Amino acid sequence: WVETCSTSPARMFGMYPKKGIIAPGSDADILVWDPNGKTKIGINDKHHMNMDHSSWEGFKVDGKVDTVLSRGKIVVENDKFTGTKGHGKFIRRGLCQYLN
């Protein structure tokens, strides 16, 4: 699952090994998923950006984000965004590693 959702995309977009792996020197970006939870999608529920509509407004989906870590720092916990302005970081892409 990690290979499919994290490692392969990081290699495809030239971001591996900074992204896509948990190892010394790599970013510790981790999402803890609760497959038994439920999530209601809506602009006032789960979107942490400036938007006024969603095509999925009101839909309920299986699964729920429990915790999100960005570079080892908790940025989502207990359904609350706890990140800080300026925490984001530009990652320069390299070549797709599958083209070698």
Report each predicted region and the residues it spans:
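Active-site microenvironment of metallo-dependent hydrolases
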Residues: V2-N100
